[in-house]
Amino acid sequence: MVQGTTSDAGKSTLVAGICRLLARQGVNVAPFKPQNMALNSAVTVDGGEIGRAQALQAAACYLVPHTDFNPILLKPSSDTGAQIIVQGKALTTLEASAFFGEKSKDYKAMALNAVLDSFERLGQQYHTIVVEGAGSPAEINLRAGDIANMGFAEAVDCPVIIIADIDKGGVFAHLVGTLALLSESEQARVKGFVINRFRGDISLLQSGIDWLEAYTQKPVLGVLPYLHDLHLDAEDALTDSPTKQAKSCFKVRVLVYPRTSNHTDVDPLRLHPDIDFDYVSLQTQALAQTPEIAADLLILPGSKNVRADLAFLREQGWDKQIAKHLRYGGKVLGICGGYQMLGERIADPLAIEDVFGTSQGLGYLPISTEFKAEKQLRCVAGELTLIGQTVAVKGYEIHCGESQYLTSSDAAKGAPLRLINELTCDEQAEKSFADGCLSEDGQVLGTYLHGLFDSPDACQLILRWAGLEDAQAIDINAIREQQLDRLADVLAEHLDLPQLQAILTASVKP
């Protein structure tokens, strides 16, 4: 099990790298994260929902995502509440006190049972399971009833490696302090450390490593270099330093609201060689010292709290910037929650996201959205038709809202996408359904389809629709595979593989 001294220490990346390293050696390996808190998620082969990082780790194992890889997923919908997803299915929305406070016993008992159930199933199918912890195991206020870190490791008798990020400073204090706050049995479970994101001459670090090993009696299993331009799906936070200027003057800007979700949708554009890409947030606008949003294509991504994020968008004056952008001939694309915002009306009569009520949309698409209790989760494939061309497209849908055209005449104009659900049986899969909406003037496009730009031909067609005539096709899946192999190569060079293998071998039950 890989645990970290802090969030963003490198746990997800190390697990993905170990998974790819083992899978390339022919080991029957799978990833596992007992409990994850993230806004980026993926649809699984069994019709559920897991954290995006576990979907990436599954790809590292050459596996399709399954709900057992991440049995508990917490998706924050406000500063104090989160949707609880258990083995792929949305269960309820709880306040923080319900799963971290004195009232948490019922939740934690249920969650632990689900976690152990999924882990046992994986143990029957795979020779090796590489487990990822969450945050830090030394959070004193979260240790009671813990199922994400040492609580899980103790329950299944799992060895632990602790990773720390040296790039932020204080790596020795982080490692020693984390170890000191663990119980004796938990300390004994820690088999070694990994130091992550090191820059410079490794010989200058050696005296610190020698001291750490002598003081803790634990080995340092490796020092991993800072990997520049490692393009892998981010678990939650936006990718560091996303701004990228290209030779082309074609500008793509993505709005960032407080509950932005599945921002990995735009990774193919962020990496596209012909695109000047950036996010638009409070921070970027403050740095630019201007409210202006200059772009050819403006994207409204998904949201875990659509009505609250729409209110935030208006508070920033971005609604006026969108209107100005369209007056000057720009294009706007809304994905999932962003699609709903572009419609006429958003209703939440059951308080699915936060509080019940109705919000007026931005009014660019003739649709009305209402949130339902049952979440739509499906992997889909089909066709996208724009500017007189039709191409293949593939992706997934995760949404509680159901959008309807306002009138039959709006519906008669046809949707830009025609899809089938890949998770259903052959007979049902033959029944295609429409998705999305294109404004009458052709400037505003909306869809529920996540992963839209992962299909090279669809990405190319949307860029042409937006005004980039000679747009190249970019294959994000091929890039992801290259980056996973690159990561595995780095681990093979910088980790003590014999020690790592000894830890794995000792943990395998007869």
Swiss-Prot record:
<dbReference type="InterPro" id="IPR004459">
    <property type="entry name" value="CobQ_synth"/>
</dbReference>
<feature type="active site" description="Nucleophile">
    <location>
        <position position="336"/>
    </location>
</feature>
<dbReference type="InterPro" id="IPR029062">
    <property type="entry name" value="Class_I_gatase-like"/>
</dbReference>
<dbReference type="GO" id="GO:0009236">
    <property type="term" value="P:cobalamin biosynthetic process"/>
</dbReference>
<feature type="active site">
    <location>
        <position position="450"/>
    </location>
</feature>
<dbReference type="InterPro" id="IPR002586">
    <property type="entry name" value="CobQ/CobB/MinD/ParA_Nub-bd_dom"/>
</dbReference>
<keyword id="KW-0169">Cobalamin biosynthesis</keyword>
<dbReference type="InterPro" id="IPR011698">
    <property type="entry name" value="GATase_3"/>
</dbReference>
<dbReference type="Pfam" id="PF01656">
    <property type="entry name" value="CbiA"/>
</dbReference>
<protein>
    <recommendedName>
        <fullName>Cobyric acid synthase</fullName>
    </recommendedName>
</protein>
<comment type="function">
    <text>Catalyzes amidations at positions B, D, E, and G on adenosylcobyrinic A,C-diamide. NH(2) groups are provided by glutamine, and one molecule of ATP is hydrogenolyzed for each amidation.</text>
</comment>
<dbReference type="InterPro" id="IPR047045">
    <property type="entry name" value="CobQ_N"/>
</dbReference>
<feature type="domain" description="GATase cobBQ-type">
    <location>
        <begin position="249"/>
        <end position="458"/>
    </location>
</feature>
<comment type="similarity">
    <text>Belongs to the CobB/CobQ family. CobQ subfamily.</text>
</comment>
<keyword id="KW-0315">Glutamine amidotransferase</keyword>
<dbReference type="InterPro" id="IPR033949">
    <property type="entry name" value="CobQ_GATase1"/>
</dbReference>
<dbReference type="GO" id="GO:0003824">
    <property type="term" value="F:catalytic activity"/>
</dbReference>
<dbReference type="InterPro" id="IPR027417">
    <property type="entry name" value="P-loop_NTPase"/>
</dbReference>
<comment type="pathway">
    <text>Cofactor biosynthesis; adenosylcobalamin biosynthesis.</text>
</comment>
<dbReference type="Pfam" id="PF07685">
    <property type="entry name" value="GATase_3"/>
</dbReference>
<dbReference type="GO" id="GO:0015420">
    <property type="term" value="F:ABC-type vitamin B12 transporter activity"/>
</dbReference>
